[in-house]
């Protein structure tokens, strides 16, 4: 598997190994992540608009955890910041960070797709 700035190779390899080295199962899990992430980002945007800090926190937490599971540690860190904003109810300044996280998600998605092709 290739190393990418968006993806922690060791984390992805550990996940792959824990799946018994089954590339099809990894592909299924990644597919679910790729389907879920846009909805989570939409939830973040909507919760920001409505000021619903708890919904915001939950969506950020989900993205943080799921991203970390696949080795997207930069994205996970961004989502951790967003989660903390939701936890404290301080959503000012969240919009640019959401956009940055969406950009990082796209980078990570490309890196994960490339890694999957090589295993």
Ranges and model annotations:
Residues 1-119:
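Two-component system phosphorelay core
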């Amino acid at each position: 598997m290739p190393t990418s700035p968006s993806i922690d190779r060791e984390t992805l390899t550990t996940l792959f190994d824990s799946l018994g080295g089954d590339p099809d199962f990894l592909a299924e899990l990644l597919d679910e992540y790729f389907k879920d992430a846009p909805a989570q980002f939409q939830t973040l945007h909507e919760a920001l608009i409505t000021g619903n800090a708890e919904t915001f926190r939950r969506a950020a937490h989900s993205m943080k955890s799921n991203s970390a599971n696949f080795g997207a540690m930069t994205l996970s860190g961004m989502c951790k910041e967003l989660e903390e904003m939701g936890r404290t109810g301080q959503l000012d300044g969240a919009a640019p960070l959401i956009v940055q996280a969406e950009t990082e998600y796209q980078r990570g998605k490309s890196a994960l797709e490339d890694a999957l092709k090589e295993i």
